Amino acid sequence: MIKARITVTLKNGVLDPQGKAIEHALAGMHFSGVGSVRQGKVFDIELSGTDRAAAEADLKAMCDRLLANTVIENYAVEIA
């Protein structure tokens, strides 16, 4: 079995209203020193099999086709 983590984040320059709302909420809760906040998504996926190259190709295809909007989001695939 192969375990992977996919992290999806907005590309630089793309507005992040949810991140901005979190940033303002943290300031309102008196957390000092918080600069910019960007929000993203994390997916933990388990795949059957042991072929890491095939797993990486499948995971990237999952991102390109469903998990990430590649017009406005970047993704990173980590295989454990």
Task: Kindly label every feature range from the protein language model.
Residues 1-80:
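Long, contiguous binding/interaction regions
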